[in-house]
Amino acid sequence: MIRTLSSASSLDEISVSYDVPVVDPTSVPKVLYGHRTSLDSLCDPEWSQESRVLVLYTGGTIGMVRNDRGKLAPIPRELETNIRRYPHMHDDSYATKRFGCNGNTPLVLPDCKEKRRVAYWVYEYEPLLDSSNMTMDDWIRIAKDIRGVYEMFDGFVVLHGTDTLAYTASALSFMLENLGKPVVITGSQIPIFETRSDGRDNFIGSVIMAGSYNIPEVTVFFNNKLYRGNRTTKVSTGRLQAFDSPNMPPLAIAGISIQVDYRSIFRPTRLEKFTVFDRLNRHVGLLRIFPSISAETVKQFLQPPISGAIIQTYGAGNMPSNRTDIMEVLRDATKRGVILVNTTQCMHGAVDTIYETGEALVSAGVIAGLDMTPEAALTKLSYVLAKSDWDYDTKKRMMMRNLRGEMTVVGQEDEGENQELDVVSAISRALQLSSSDDVERIRDLLVPTLFFTAVSNCDIKRLEEIFSNGAEVNLLDVSGWSALHMAACDGIAEVVTWLLQHGASVHVRDKQGQTPLKIAVENDHHKVVELLVQTGAHLTESPLRLGEVLVSAAAADNVERLKSYHIAGADLSCADPCGRTALHAACTVGSEECVRFLLEAGVPTTTRDRTDLTPAMCAQVNNHDHLARLIDEQEE
């Protein structure tokens, strides 16, 4: 796992090792590299000023440029160079002023009137691929590259050809488990650098969404709409509105301003860190039912090595009920352990077993896929089948469960879920409001205040009530604090747990760039720090800045602060600009408690500062010989 950023200069150096078996032998091995932009600037201690976005360019129309013959082609190592020439995609004056003029500064979007400026890095794969040539191994490579630098960036953008974009978006949504940051996939019908271009808007919009909005999902941004990735499908070969989400409205619409439907965001609710599941089962398929299809065709399709299949049926999931031969083939397949999922051939709507013909499929052991798109159903099946620790029944249950917002599961509503908050009802009556729109406006005004008050009062029952009335768990107050910031500051572990279980983001930053983890660390709430780290929170300071705060804590004899940083995953051996570590500082001031703790934590004892002093030398110079002896005993 990456612990520091100081030595990172390319993704090739920091990506995790790829020891995963090849899924598809026709897959073309790829190399990921950057052209000019170095990751060294990530060590800047003042990174709270900007959001950081990594752009991964896989190929496709969006990045094509005209070659010597005037034809559009994917030319390697040209994308970033060309972006730097466009002032609406790169603010060169800001980048030079902020990062210097050494030629490898990050790209920076012009001011978009968002909370923070967005700096971004472009890395591209070699070879660049037409998306028709994408394989499951490419999905795995993208997922693992994101994992390798996950803690360095606030969001990710994947540039992709449109033909298989929906498959990639769906696959990544399942593979990226407990995702806490935005991953936005985009492409275009016209390249970025053409005079008329949807690619330019799609690119800029994607970088803004990844860097400025707390939407921890794999999404698709296209034609000014942000869709849930596993709900999308390509609907046109020639229109700029090439993608749609047939059974779910967009998560965000970019007009004059960007309107986000925060209530629809599918957030992780498990107290677990982000991980990548890097196995997929390619022995899956799509079988579209048509009139007079032969039982032999279906039988051959379901022969080994097939492990699962999506059956695309008529209407609301119907099959010809008089075709007992086909039903018998399906029944035999499910008895052999093949997982079959029933989805509709229609663009809109869902599978329902209200008809006799649909019920017959259920009796044959076929699972209802509800309103999943073919892309989502297929990639979900590939993901589920690859889970070797799940038995057959568990895999079937998981296919029927809404894992990443890919399907609409209609359940019984909780009793009282839609009841109005008592205070909203009281005020509405007092103001004699009769319009539902007026009541909704009152609710929008009051709910944030009520929510923050309940957090402050540690009132879980009230939080449940307000949440059931549509409160957004990641609401921000005027200082940019979320409810999780507030609970982390107060050290209320019970409330922190509740917020995390209801989708609170551990990565939200306030106006000073501080995360809830940083707030908890600075207040030495160790239990809260543990909870946040367990859920994927990580420190965002550069090693140099971390060295400064650790040295300050040790110099102040603040062992609790050192413990807080240790629990948060900090490298306690980080040095400040003078080369001093926390152990140097503790030995200088004579803090035996800090020295003992740092030694137990494994901090090196031989590090020399800029004056060539080791921690033991610092102890001796300041007449703390007992500390020097402690260090000698440790070295022995």
Q: Where do the PLM segments sit?
A:
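Ankyrin repeat boundary/linker residues
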Residues: 477, 510, 543-544, 576, ...
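Accessory alpha-helical/coil subdomains and C-terminal extensions
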Residues: 50, 56, 60, 78-100, ...
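Short Gly/Thr/Asp-enriched flexible loops that form oxyanion-binding sites at enzyme active sites
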Residues: 159-181, 321-329, 353-356
